[in-house]
Protein backbone atom coordinates (compact mmCIF):
# COMPACT_ATOMS: atom_id res chain seq x y z
CA UNK A 1 0.00 0.00 0.00
CA UNK A 2 3.09 2.24 -0.27
CA UNK A 3 3.16 3.38 3.34
CA UNK A 4 6.08 3.98 5.67
CA UNK A 5 5.68 3.41 9.42
CA UNK A 6 8.14 5.33 11.61
CA UNK A 7 8.60 4.81 15.34
CA UNK A 8 9.00 8.20 17.04
CA UNK A 9 9.89 7.02 20.52
CA UNK A 10 10.77 10.39 22.02
CA UNK A 11 7.29 11.65 21.15
CA UNK A 12 5.50 8.42 22.12
CA UNK A 13 3.96 7.85 18.71
CA UNK A 14 4.12 6.13 15.33
CA UNK A 15 4.03 8.25 12.18
CA UNK A 16 2.54 6.89 8.96
CA UNK A 17 3.69 8.38 5.64
CA UNK A 18 2.13 7.93 2.21
CA UNK A 19 5.15 7.17 0.03
CA UNK A 20 3.44 6.65 -3.31
CA UNK A 21 5.88 7.89 -6.00
CA UNK A 22 3.67 10.82 -6.97
CA UNK A 23 3.27 11.98 -3.34
CA UNK A 24 6.68 11.58 -1.75
CA UNK A 25 8.58 14.83 -1.32
CA UNK A 26 11.24 16.40 0.89
CA UNK A 27 9.71 17.75 4.08
CA UNK A 28 6.39 16.01 3.49
CA UNK A 29 3.88 15.67 6.32
CA UNK A 30 2.85 12.35 7.83
CA UNK A 31 -0.66 11.25 6.92
CA UNK A 32 -1.60 9.52 10.19
CA UNK A 33 -0.29 9.34 13.76
CA UNK A 34 -0.75 6.43 16.16
CA UNK A 35 -0.38 6.83 19.92
CA UNK A 36 -1.48 10.49 19.98
CA UNK A 37 -4.71 12.30 19.18
CA UNK A 38 -2.90 14.91 17.08
CA UNK A 39 0.46 15.64 15.48
CA UNK A 40 1.33 18.18 18.21
CA UNK A 41 0.64 15.92 21.23
CA UNK A 42 3.45 13.85 22.73
CA UNK A 43 2.41 12.61 26.18
CA UNK A 44 3.13 8.96 27.06
CA UNK A 45 0.19 6.85 28.11
CA UNK A 46 -1.17 3.41 28.89
CA UNK A 47 -4.29 2.36 27.00
CA UNK A 48 -5.37 0.70 23.76
CA UNK A 49 -4.65 4.00 21.97
CA UNK A 50 -1.55 5.28 23.75
CA UNK A 51 2.03 4.11 24.13
CA UNK A 52 5.26 4.95 25.92
CA UNK A 53 8.62 5.04 24.13
CA UNK A 54 7.67 2.85 21.17
CA UNK A 55 10.67 1.35 19.47
CA UNK A 56 10.92 -1.42 16.92
CA UNK A 57 8.13 -2.17 14.45
CA UNK A 58 7.25 -5.32 12.51
CA UNK A 59 4.76 -5.48 9.64
CA UNK A 60 2.58 -8.40 8.60
CA UNK A 61 1.78 -7.69 4.94
CA UNK A 62 -0.65 -10.60 4.60
CA UNK A 63 -2.75 -9.79 7.65
CA UNK A 64 -2.07 -6.05 7.41
CA UNK A 65 -1.03 -5.87 11.05
CA UNK A 66 1.56 -3.64 12.65
CA UNK A 67 3.39 -4.91 15.74
CA UNK A 68 4.71 -2.10 17.94
CA UNK A 69 7.32 -2.62 20.65
CA UNK A 70 5.84 -0.42 23.41
CA UNK A 71 8.94 -0.57 25.59
CA UNK A 72 7.79 1.85 28.28
CA UNK A 73 4.78 -0.35 28.97
CA UNK A 74 6.50 -3.75 28.67
CA UNK A 75 4.26 -4.95 25.86
CA UNK A 76 3.71 -5.27 22.13
CA UNK A 77 0.67 -3.54 20.63
CA UNK A 78 -0.98 -5.03 17.54
CA UNK A 79 -2.75 -2.64 15.15
CA UNK A 80 -4.98 -3.37 12.17
CA UNK A 81 -3.44 -1.13 9.52
CA UNK A 82 -5.62 -2.03 6.55
CA UNK A 83 -5.99 1.27 4.61
CA UNK A 84 -9.76 1.40 5.01
CA UNK A 85 -9.52 1.04 8.80
CA UNK A 86 -6.33 2.87 9.77
CA UNK A 87 -6.86 6.30 11.28
CA UNK A 88 -5.18 8.76 13.64
CA UNK A 89 -5.30 7.70 17.31
CA UNK A 90 -6.49 4.23 16.30
CA UNK A 91 -7.33 1.62 18.91
CA UNK A 92 -4.99 -1.38 19.00
CA UNK A 93 -6.64 -4.71 18.20
CA UNK A 94 -4.61 -6.74 20.66
CA UNK A 95 -1.73 -6.71 23.14
CA UNK A 96 1.08 -9.14 23.93
CA UNK A 97 3.04 -9.34 27.17
CA UNK A 98 0.21 -8.01 29.35
CA UNK A 99 -3.23 -9.35 30.34
CA UNK A 100 -5.00 -6.16 29.23
CA UNK A 101 -4.41 -2.66 27.87
CA UNK A 102 -4.27 -1.04 31.33
CA UNK A 103 -1.40 -3.07 32.82
CA UNK A 104 2.28 -2.21 32.33
CA UNK A 105 4.15 -3.91 35.18
CA UNK A 106 7.10 -6.11 34.17
CA UNK A 107 6.13 -9.78 34.24
CA UNK A 108 8.31 -12.71 35.21
CA UNK A 109 6.14 -15.52 33.85
CA UNK A 110 6.35 -17.00 30.35
CA UNK A 111 3.75 -14.58 28.99
CA UNK A 112 5.80 -11.50 29.89
CA UNK A 113 8.85 -10.02 28.22
CA UNK A 114 11.09 -6.97 28.12
CA UNK A 115 10.43 -5.55 24.68
CA UNK A 116 13.23 -4.66 22.31
CA UNK A 117 13.69 -5.27 18.60
CA UNK A 118 11.07 -7.11 16.56
CA UNK A 119 11.27 -9.28 13.45
CA UNK A 120 8.35 -10.99 11.67
CA UNK A 121 8.52 -14.10 9.49
CA UNK A 122 5.64 -13.87 7.03
CA UNK A 123 5.91 -17.51 5.93
CA UNK A 124 5.45 -19.00 9.38
CA UNK A 125 3.62 -16.13 11.15
CA UNK A 126 6.29 -16.07 13.85
CA UNK A 127 7.21 -12.94 15.78
CA UNK A 128 10.74 -12.72 17.18
CA UNK A 129 11.23 -10.38 20.15
CA UNK A 130 14.75 -9.35 21.18
CA UNK A 131 14.80 -8.71 24.90
CA UNK A 132 17.74 -6.43 25.61
CA UNK A 133 17.18 -4.57 28.87
CA UNK A 134 19.57 -4.52 31.81
CA UNK A 135 18.01 -7.59 33.45
CA UNK A 136 20.33 -10.47 32.58
CA UNK A 137 17.50 -12.99 32.19
CA UNK A 138 16.05 -10.90 29.36
CA UNK A 139 19.13 -10.88 27.13
CA UNK A 140 17.47 -13.29 24.74
CA UNK A 141 15.10 -13.69 21.78
CA UNK A 142 11.67 -15.19 22.32
CA UNK A 143 9.63 -16.67 19.46
CA UNK A 144 5.83 -16.43 19.28
CA UNK A 145 3.10 -17.84 17.06
CA UNK A 146 1.11 -14.78 15.93
CA UNK A 147 -1.00 -16.47 13.26
CA UNK A 148 -4.51 -15.14 12.70
CA UNK A 149 -6.15 -17.73 14.96
CA UNK A 150 -3.57 -17.48 17.78
CA UNK A 151 -4.54 -16.04 21.17
CA UNK A 152 -1.97 -13.24 21.39
CA UNK A 153 -2.84 -11.96 24.85
CA UNK A 154 -2.34 -15.40 26.37
CA UNK A 155 0.57 -16.37 24.12
CA UNK A 156 3.57 -18.15 25.57
CA UNK A 157 6.81 -18.36 23.57
CA UNK A 158 7.41 -21.36 21.34
CA UNK A 159 11.15 -21.16 21.92
CA UNK A 160 13.92 -19.02 23.34
CA UNK A 161 17.10 -18.16 21.41
CA UNK A 162 20.32 -16.88 22.92
CA UNK A 163 19.87 -18.89 26.11
CA UNK A 164 19.86 -22.68 26.65
CA UNK A 165 16.45 -22.45 28.34
CA UNK A 166 13.81 -20.11 29.72
CA UNK A 167 15.42 -20.15 33.17
CA UNK A 168 19.01 -19.50 32.05
CA UNK A 169 20.38 -16.14 33.20
CA UNK A 170 24.16 -16.14 32.80
CA UNK A 171 25.47 -13.67 30.18
CA UNK A 172 27.84 -16.21 28.64
CA UNK A 173 29.09 -15.74 25.10
CA UNK A 174 28.98 -19.03 23.21
CA UNK A 175 27.40 -20.66 20.18
CA UNK A 176 24.02 -20.90 21.91
CA UNK A 177 24.14 -17.78 24.10
CA UNK A 178 24.25 -14.05 23.38
CA UNK A 179 24.33 -10.67 25.08
CA UNK A 180 22.24 -7.64 24.03
CA UNK A 181 20.61 -9.17 20.92
CA UNK A 182 19.30 -6.77 18.29
CA UNK A 183 16.65 -7.38 15.62
CA UNK A 184 15.06 -5.27 12.91
CA UNK A 185 12.83 -5.45 9.86
CA UNK A 186 15.66 -6.93 7.75
CA UNK A 187 16.62 -9.62 10.27
CA UNK A 188 15.04 -12.53 8.35
CA UNK A 189 16.54 -13.22 4.95
CA UNK A 190 15.16 -15.03 1.89
CA UNK A 191 16.61 -18.34 3.13
CA UNK A 192 14.60 -18.07 6.40
CA UNK A 193 17.72 -17.33 8.39
CA UNK A 194 17.42 -15.05 11.42
CA UNK A 195 20.26 -12.53 11.51
CA UNK A 196 21.02 -11.29 15.02
CA UNK A 197 23.49 -8.56 15.93
CA UNK A 198 24.86 -8.79 19.48
CA UNK A 199 26.91 -6.40 21.54
CA UNK A 200 28.29 -6.03 25.02
What is the meaning of each model-derived region?
Residues 1-2, 46-63, 107-124, 171-193:
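Signature of short aromatic-glycine-proline-rich micro-motifs recurring in repeat-based ectodomains
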Residues 6, 68, 129-130, 196-197:
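Residue position within the beta-strands of beta-propeller blades
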Residues 9-10, 19, 71-72, 81, ...:
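Short loop/turn segments immediately following the C-termini of beta-strands
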Residues 10, 29, 53, 72, ...:
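Beta-rich catalytic cores
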Residues 10, 62, 72, 123, ...:
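Short loop/turn segments that connect beta-strands within the blades of beta-propeller domains
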Residues 12-16, 29, 74-78, 91-94, ...:
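A short loop-to-beta-strand structural motif that recurs across blades of beta-propeller domains
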Residues 18-27, 79-89, 144-154:
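Short loop/turn segments immediately following beta-strands, especially the blade-tip
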Residues 27-49, 88-110, 153-178:
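Surface-exposed loop and turn segments in beta-propeller and other repeat-based domains
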